[in-house]
Regions:
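Predominantly flavin-linked oxidoreductase catalytic cores and closely associated redox partners
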Residues: 4-116, 133, 149
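C-terminal helical "tail/cap" subdomain of flavin- and related membrane-associated enzymes
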Residues: 174-268
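Electropositive phosphate-/nucleotide-binding environments in soluble metabolic enzymes
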Residues: 41, 71, 75, 98-99, ...
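Short secondary-structure transition/capping segments
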Residues: 31-41, 91-102, 168, 172-173, ...
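FAD/FMN-dependent oxidoreductases across multiple families
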Residues: 96-178
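Generic detection of short hydrophobic beta-strand segments and adjacent strand-loop junctions
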Residues: 14-15, 127, 227
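Mobile, glycine/GP-rich and aromatic-enriched active-site lid/loop segments adjacent to catalytic centers
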Residues: 73, 82-85, 90, 113-125, ...
Length: 268
C-alpha cells in the first residue's frame, strides 16, 4: 500500500502497488519505515535564502558561483553564493547542531554585500553524506536519490545522482516484474556503486581530510589553484568518473596533498 497526499486538494488516497520506489528525499519516511538502519547515516543541514539579485558589483558577479570556506560561516562544510539570473541563492551547510544557520547566512550576506537585497524565500533541507548500505527491503521497496543517500561528498551535488539512481531503481523494478522475483531490487545499489563508488570514496576522503579546520580548508583552496587539479576535477565532474589521463599530473597532485596534510608547506 502506498499513501499519496495530493497537495492541491489535501486528499489522501490509497494505492495498491506491487513495488514502491522511495524517492521522498533525505530522511525518507519510506526508508525509515521499510529499510533497516536507514536513519544511521550522517547529514549536513543546508540552509539558503533566495534573494533578488543586485546588479554586478565589486563583490557580486552574476556570471560567477562563489564557494566560501570560512569557519565563521561553516566550521565543517562551506557557504555559497549562486546566481540564478534575476535571483541568487545565498546559503551554507553544517553537520553541527551548535551552528545557527540563519545567523551564519546573514553574516555571509553581509560579507558578500548582499544584506540589503530583498529576500524572496528561505529554505532548509538535510543533505546525506554517504549512500545507505542497503537500498531495498528484499520485498517490494527500493530507494533512489537523496532517500538512498546519493549526494556527492565535498560538493553536495545530488541532482545528477538522483536522476541516474532513479533510472537504476526503475531498471531493477522492471527486472523484478519481468522475472517475478524481488531479488533483483539489489541491482539498483549494485549498479550505481559499480559506476560511482570510486568518485564517492575520493570525495569523501577529501572532505574528511580538508573540511575539518580553517587551516585545512585554506590548504584545499591552495590546491585548487593548481591548473592540473582544475583540469582533472573538471573532467571528472563532467563525466562523473575519475579522470585517468595525465598520470604525471596525478602523481604531482598526490605529493602536493601529502605536503599539505603533513604541514610541509604553507597555504597561500
Amino acid at each position: 500500500m502506498c499513501i499519496r497526499d495530493s497537495h492541491s486538494t489535501k486528499k489522501i488516497s490509497t494505492l495498491l502497488t506491487r513495488y514502491v520506489i522511495g524517492a521522498d528525499g533525505a530522511k525518507s519516511n519510506v526508508a525509515r519505515n521499510t529499510i533497516k538502519d536507514a536513519h544511521k547515516i550522517p547529514y549536513v543541514i543546508a540552509y539558503h535564502e533566495i534573494i533578488e539579485a543586485p546588479r554586478e558589483t565589486s563583490e557580486y558577479n552574476p556570471d560567477r558561483c562563489d564557494v566560501i570556506y570560512n569557519g565563521d560561516i561553516s566550521p565543517d562544510f562551506y557557504g555559497w553564493v549562486f546566481p540564478h539570473g534575476k535571483s541568487a541563492s545565498v546559503g551554507m551547510g553544517t553537520g553541527l547542531n551548535s551552528v545557527n544557520l540563519k545567523k551564519a547566512t546573514s553574516a555571509l550576506r553581509t560579507q558578500a554585500g548582499l544584506d540589503k537585497c530583498s529576500t524572496i524565500r528561505k529554505e532548509g533541507a538535510p543533505i546525506p553524506l554517504k549512500p545507505l548500505e542497503r537500498w531495498d527491503n528484499g520485498d517490494n521497496v527500493v530507494l533512489a536519490g537523496d532517500a538512498a543517500g546519493v549526494v556527492a561528498p565535498s560538493s553536495g551535488e545530488g541532482i545528477y545522482y538522483a536522476m541516474i539512481g532513479g533510472k537504476y531503481a526503475a531498471d531493477a523494478v522492471e527486472k523484478c516484474l519481468l522475472n517475478g522475483h524481488s531479488k533483483y531490487l539489489t541491482l539498483a545499489r549494485r549498479n550505481f556503486m559499480k559506476e560511482h563508488k570510486a568518485v564517492f570514496q575520493v570525495l569523501g576522503a577529501m572532505q574528511n581530510a580538508y573540511y575539518r579546520s580553517d587551516d585545512r580548508r585554506e590548504r584545499f583552496v591552495t590546491l585548487c589553484k593548481d591548473i592540473d587539479v582544475q583540469r582533472i576535477t573538471f573532467e571528472s565532474y563532467m563525466h562523473k568518473k575519475l579522470s585517468r589521463s595525465r598520470p604525471i599530473a596525478h602523481l604531482k597532485i598526490m605529493f602536493k596533498n601529502i605536503a599539505h596534510l603533513t604541514g610541509m608547506v604553507k597555504a597561500t
